[in-house]
Amino acid sequence: MAKSLVLSSLLLALLLAAPLASLADNNVLLTGDVLHTDNQLSFESAAFVMQGDCNLVLYNEAGGFQSNTHGRGVGCTLRLNNFGQLEIHSANSNTPVWVSLRNGIPVRGDYAAVLGPDQHVTIYGPAIWSTPAPNRHERGATVSNIPRVRNVLFSSQVMSDNAQLATRDYSLVMRDDCNLALTKGSKTNIVWESGTSGRGQHCFMRLGHTGLIEISDDRLNTVWRSNTVGQEGDYVLILQINGQAVVYGPAVWSTASPARGGASAAL
C-alpha cells in the first residue's frame, strides 16, 4: 500500500484542486470544519484526502494511512468532532461510517488536526489558550529541530528577532522590542499584544510541552507567560484565518502512531 500511496501522491496533488471548506489554512482542520468529498488537507508533498469512494487516505512518503472505508458510503465528508475524533459521514446515513480512536479520556472542547512537516496528521486539543476573537461573527529556550510551518508553532519551537506566524492578512510577530503582537494588514494595526514592549533585550517566545507560551529575555528571565498549563505532551499554536492565535493540545491521535491511538474504528 505504501508504495502505491507514494506513487499516487503527486497525481492527486494536481487533480484535487477544490478548496477546503474551512476557516483554517489547508494544512489544518478545526472542530466544526468539514472536508468535503474529493477535498484535502495538504502540506508540501503530503495530502490527506476525503476520496469520492468514501476512503480517507493519507498520501505521503512515510508509509501513508487509510480508513479502509472504500465503498461504505456516498458523498462522504470528514469532520473533526468536539472530542478530538475524526468522523466520516455518508450523505445517505445519520450514523458515522468511521470514527478515529483517541488517547486518554475524551474531553469536550475545540480541537485541531494538523498535517505537519513529518507528513502525518496529528490531532491536538482541547484548546487551552487563545487571543480574543476579533469578530464574533467569524467562527469559531531549547530550539527544536522541527521544520518551521508558516501558520503553526509546535512544542519546543522558538520565535525571536521579528519571526512570525502568518495567515491571510494576519501575523503573530515576536518583535525585537520584546512585544508579542498580533497584527492585521499593516504592522501598526495591532489586534492583540502581550504588552511587553521594552521589558527585555533579545527576547524570544517559546511554546512548551504543557501548552504554556512564555516570553523570556536573553538572561532567561520570564517577561510574560500565558498562564494556561495543560498536561504534559505535544501542543501546537495555530494562527487561524479568523485572526485568533490558539493553543491546542496535547496530541490525542496521529496517523503516525496506530499502536498508541492512531488505529481507527470502522462502525
UniProtKB/Swiss-Prot annotation:
Domain Bulb-type lectin: 26-136, 150-260
Biological-process GO terms, alphabetical: response to other organism
Subunit (UniProt): Heterotetramer of 2 domain 1 and 2 domain 2 chains arranged as a dimer of domain 1/domain 2 heterodimers.
Keywords, alphabetical: Disulfide bond, Hemagglutinin, Lectin, Mannose-binding, Repeat, Signal
CDD domains: B_lectin
Record Gene3D superfamilies: Bulb-type lectin domain
Residues annotated as signal peptide: 1-24
Chain's role: Mannose-specific lectin. Has weak agglutinating activity towards trypsin-treated erythrocytes from rabbit but not from human.
Disulphide linkage map: 54-76, 178-203
UniProt-listed InterPro entries: Bulb-type_lectin_dom (IPR001480), Bulb-type_lectin_dom_sf (IPR036426)
Organism encoding this protein: Crocus vernus (Dutch crocus)
GO terms for MF: D-mannose binding
Name recorded for this polypeptide: Mannose-specific lectin 1
